[in-house]
Amino acid sequence: MKLGIVGLPNVGKSTLFNAITNAGAESANYPFCTIEPNVGMVAVPDERLDKLAEMYQPKKKTPAVVEFVDIAGLVKGASQGAGLGNKFLENIRRTDAIVHVVRCFDDENIMHVVADASTNVPVDPLGDIETIDLELIMADLEIARRRAEKAAKLAKSGDKKFLHEAEVFQRLSAHLDAGKSARTFDAGEDAELINGAELLSLKPIIYAANLDEDGFANQEGNKYLQQVAELAAREGAQVLPICAKLEQDIAELEGEEKQMFLEELGIAESGLDRLIKCSYSLLGLISFLTYGEDECRAWTIRKGTKAPQAAGKIHSDIERGFIRAEVIAYDDMIKYGSVNAAKEKGQLRSEGKEYVVQDGDMIYFRFNV
């Protein structure tokens, strides 16, 4: 899974990236301090995998990973190449989802890059969101218009498929031209057609509302957070309150020291853990587990994935030669204390090609090639 972290300059984007990846990207109070995308691979926290590793003491423990990409800041006009716009748009196109960092706290010492320099607004999360959204929408509008024109030309041959495609992209063009994102377009039965266009404003989005420590402790009283939450609810997006500077402090701690610090703050889990969970939920992802003395490993798949395709995540030969999946639910294994005890209680299931893998399934694949 690849998540692109975006945001206007000076909203805390690189600070958050540094905190969650410990990648040390330069963070400075001026635009474009992140010129090339910084990439950080982060292990997905999974207590189930930790427990299996504790039980089996394998040679290797391999968690699922999330790739975070800190994408260069942009300004108004990016879709026309202003600022670092072209780089921004190309880099974001390669991601599975967008984490849009928006500043939700006042600080007169932080320079705010506004879309219109004549408007002296110190903090304007909705305006910041609109600035980036419009650049994505304008880039998509160019694509939609080209698709409509191409389909219209091909439709002259009398092919009804292209006539329909031209109509769909003409409707989409009008929708985008009105300043609305592709996410809010009613594609109906044409969703697959629209998805194939790889539109930027169609990507799932998480608004990371960056708060200062006071705002994080008193979220209900933060008017900026409430504005972002209301927008996210209307769009069907996710909102994640986070304090980037606090996350930096948390990232420097480990083990019991980290847990004690979180407890002192009254936080159950770090912002990174919450962001990963939010991302999994947004993208409809789950994990299954493989286990043994050589390796215990978590694998990420989409909800609804059938057993052979899940096996293909491990190796294409296993998918090609799939015979069956021997499955134990993790919760059943914990309930009975071990895999062998769960087997004795009849909890080992033999599943075929149509089995839909569930979150937390512990699987051994039988195959022959």
Report residues per predicted region.
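Substrate-engagement module of ASCE P-loop NTPases
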Residues: 94, 135, 140, 230-235
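Short, conserved glycine- and acidic-residue-centered signature motifs
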Residues: 81, 137, 221
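C-terminal-of-GTPase-core extension/linker across diverse P-loop GTPases
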Residues: 2-6, 11, 17, 145, ...
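Amphipathic alpha-helical coiled-coil segments with heptad-repeat character
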Residues: 85, 122, 129, 134, ...
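Conserved G1/Walker A P-loop phosphate-binding module
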Residues: 1-120, 126, 133, 144, ...
